[in-house]
Amino acid sequence: MGSSSPAQTSNWYELFTGNWLSRPIRAVLVGALALPFVIWPRNQPQNSNPRLLAFFVYLLHLASIPWLYLVTKLVPEPYLDEIFHIPQAQKYCQGRFLEWDDKITTPPGLYLVSLITPGVVQRNGYLDYACSVQNLRAFNVFALAVLAYLALQCRREIEARLYEARFSTRLSNTSQYAVHTAFNIAFFPLLFFFSGLYYTDVASTAAVLVAFLNHLKRIGRDQNSVLSDLVTISLGVFTLFFRQTNVFWVVVFMGGLEAVHAVKTLRPERVDQPVILTLSEQLKHYAWRCSLGDVHDPPLHAMWPDDMIFCVLSLGIAALCNPIRVIRQIWPYITTLLLFGSFVAWNGGVVLGDKSNHVATIHLPQMLYIWPFFAFFSLPLLIPYALPLANALRRLLYMKTSSWSISSSSNKSLSRKSSSKVSNSKGDVAVDAPGSEYPQPSKELQYFEVVFGSKIFLWPLYLLGTIIFSFGIVHYNTIIHPFTLADNRHYMFYVFRYTIRRAAWIRFALVIPYTVARWMTWGTMAGCSQWFMTMHGPACSAYSKGDGKSPFLNHPAFTNRGASPQQTDAAPPAEVKDLDANQQQELSQALKKDPLLASVEPATTSTGLIFLLATTLSLMTAPLVEPRYFIIPWVMWRLLVPAWKFHDHDSEGVAATLERHPKTKPLLLFLQRYDLRLILETFWFIVINAVTGYIFLTKPYVWKAEDGTVLDGGRLQRFMW
């Protein structure tokens, strides 16, 4: 074995000592790494996983610092969009705030926050400042560490809000799932890659997470102070300084969720459903209950196509009937929207600088492309979809049963259920049984119950409708931006080249992968979903909590025929109360026994629909398909994904097999206490980051014309996202 050369030894010394960065920047990076421990609440419960937090903090340090070092050494000059961002930031460093490069179309938030970071600005004279390329890039490493901490706090608050909505008790625990999820978000290939370059994406995402964290704290209270409202406006405007499309995430997503929160805090008294015989009276009763705040908003794992319709309808009625309460909650977001509108009017358009190449165009295929994007990067999260297939293969191999028996038993079970009742999203809608003492409802009401209560009827129609709509989008609205065709430095160039540009029929054939990817990503956000019909049964975490019904169920197809006078026996969430010492001790013991106890709760239907609306609005006006545009939608989706235990979706399959063998039983116990997908997701991201980083750093090339003439002055080109 040969020894390392002095030059190699020097390089490694520079890497780990940080001498290649200015002293203030080194101090900032160390401060960023220490940030979680400095801000970490001192009164955290014992099961708040500080060791796991420390492990991921230093894992992020060991990944991001060498990445920045390698980029600085091998790509010392500004590359691609950096040739616009870095000179503009350097102008700001010199105090030339009125000079602007018209080729830059995004606001100056990145340049402004870079100025207030110690070490980025180095004083060379009385009023002369200079920002070096490496120090400006180092700011994004700092921003990535801040983003990881914000993601941790956001996931913690999401779990707390969902737990409080179910049990009306305050949750102060920081779960292992929240810690690992946050740092997987920081390792997300697009965020990690651009943390080594001076791009706006990392800082913009962190800014949105600041506003999102503030929003999550606001919905933890019934009422908010004027100071909280002013802070919300300030944070909303702050996000707009990084990217204009952030307005959709602040105003539509967060504002929409707060409008739903305002309606749900009405807390109407629970009443029995009267015996109603006509459709008109049934709809009147439904509208009256909605106006009081008795809305229909089941958890995502229990959502069916009709639930989406009645969720929107019930929330709309409740908001229209309680406008003052809703406006009092969302006026900060309305103000943010008005301020943004004033800027657009003053600027003469949404984008800054050159508007010719950034003309807003309706581009709905973006909402088809995003699902394969999610599915590819979150491939390990789709493991639950493989277990039913694995079980079917296992049964086939051992000749115990066939895969057809699963389908037939499921159909028989559903037939028996539908013959006696029509199930709604979280309750059972009783239909007249023979010999019932109740009078017969009208034919219109019976038809209404069958159409909107039968999931077997609605689900195929919904699936067929989405497929037809997708074909229409592909046929009438496929747009290929000139930048996509002209720039072979981006991976998207090759994706388009070998898929939708290869042949017209491929565009239409891809509708099936789009649909499957959408189904899987929505099912992942739903947790243990009913799309698996009876294959999960009571083993699903979301069903094994005892009181499995949501308090927000008001389906108009529910009628009282004597079986049950109410759709749900769950009480509406009361004001959240702090636990006393004994209750806190009991909760801590429960969380110690089951670390995923508070992490398996899925978001509500309204949250999923508002997320879909915000994603659509933020993408549909962009003619250019750019993976960086999908970063914030992915981050928000990833934060909403609940935890998964290995036995979920798998009551009688692989998990049961592992439990029967003494050698594999400890492994099963671990997988029921820790989400296996997180570990696989970490390794998946490491592989993607290693491959794309290696290609970017070591596979440069020179642009040449068809006749061999060197283009772009012979500058090296590199592959990137």
Swiss-Prot record:
Pfam families: DIE2_ALG10 (PF04922). Its EC number is 2.4.1.256. GO terms for cellular component: endoplasmic reticulum membrane. One of its GO terms (molecular function) is dolichyl pyrophosphate Glc2Man9GlcNAc2 alpha-1,2-glucosyltransferase activity. It is an enzyme of class 2 (transferase). Dol-P-Glc:Glc(2)Man(9)GlcNAc(2)-PP-Dol alpha-1,2-glucosyltransferase that operates in the biosynthetic pathway of dolichol-linked oligosaccharides, the glycan precursors employed in protein asparagine (N)-glycosylation. The assembly of dolichol-linked oligosaccharides begins on the cytosolic side of the endoplasmic reticulum membrane and finishes in its lumen. The sequential addition of sugars to dolichol pyrophosphate produces dolichol-linked oligosaccharides containing fourteen sugars, including two GlcNAcs, nine mannoses and three glucoses. Belongs to the ALG10 glucosyltransferase family. This is Dol-P-Glc:Glc(2)Man(9)GlcNAc(2)-PP-Dol alpha-1,2-glucosyltransferase. It comes from Gibberella zeae (strain ATCC MYA-4620 / CBS 123657 / FGSC 9075 / NRRL 31084 / PH-1). The gene is ALG10.
